[in-house]
Design a protein with these regions (language model features):
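N-terminal hydrophobic signal-anchor/signal peptide
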Residues: 1-48, 154-158, 178, 182-194
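A hydrophobic, helix-centered structural microdomain
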Residues: 3-7, 22-95, 130
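Short, glycine-rich, amphipathic interfacial segments at transmembrane boundaries or analogous
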Residues: 4-15, 71-109, 170-194
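Acidic side chains
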Residues: 39, 64-65, 96, 107, ...
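Glycine-centered flexibility sites
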Residues: 46, 66-67, 77-80, 99, ...
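Short, hydrophobic secondary-structure boundary micro-motifs
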Residues: 57, 100, 139-141, 146-147, ...
Length: 194
């Protein structure tokens, strides 16, 4: 089912929509411990079998510019709790201080290795560590930076009731946001609830 169809079924009245989402969450409450168990097993297994890939990516980043392997950024997690998301670094050091908050087009801050990591989404693999620590889930609403969460309306805030995910339906649909910028997929978190 398309994202548009999913949202077309939401009531126009935000209070009714919030009540519907709360009912869905209550109904799925028993599933959450099983989902967490699956996250632990899958992320631990993924980290184990992907160790050679992690080492290769780390070596490539070090050989490219000698900087740190990981990039950490503060994101908003479940129940609004901030956490430090991990990614393999794809930009020059201190890039967040030297440009736009979004990467667009041929951003000169992206390293050569970083271009490959972004194109293949290998930079996201480090988030398996966030999943294992319980800060994220494999599937859920994408974790946003605080400045976007501050703009959420009450319905959008419902997504914060879930553990953020490494992937979600919007991440698949808007896979390459650097070519075609769309507003942050704020409402995508609600799709994860459904």
């Amino acid at each position: 089912m398309s994202i548009k169809k999913k949202f077309s079924s939401l009531p126009a009245d935000q209070d009714a929509a919030i009540a519907e989402v709360e009912a869905i969450l209550r109904h799925k409450r028993w599933q959450m411990p099983f989902k967490r168990g699956l996250d632990i097993v899958a992320s631990a297994f993924g980290l184990l079998i992907l160790t050679p890939v992690f080492l290769g990516v780390a070596l490539a980043i070090k050989l490219d510019d000698g900087g740190p392997v990981f990039y950490r950024q503060l994101r908003v997690g479940r129940n609004g709790k901030p956490f430090s998301i991990l990614k393999f670094r794809t930009m020059v050091q201190n890039a967040d201080r030297a440009g736009l908050p979004l990467t667009v087009g041929a951003d000169p801050r992206v390293t050569k290795v970083g271009q490959l990591l972004r194109r293949t989404k290998l930079d996201e693999l480090a988030q398996l560590m966030n999943v294992l620590r319980g800060e994220m889930s494999l599937v859920g609403p994408r974790p946003e930076v605080l400045r976007y969460v501050d703009m959420y309306d009450p319905l959008q805030r419902m997504a914060l009731r879930l553990r953020p995910g490494v992937t979600d339906p919007a991440s698949i649909r808007y896979r390459d946001e650097t070519r075609c910028w769309v507003p942050p997929p704020i409402r995508s978190g609600l799709i994860s609830i459904r």
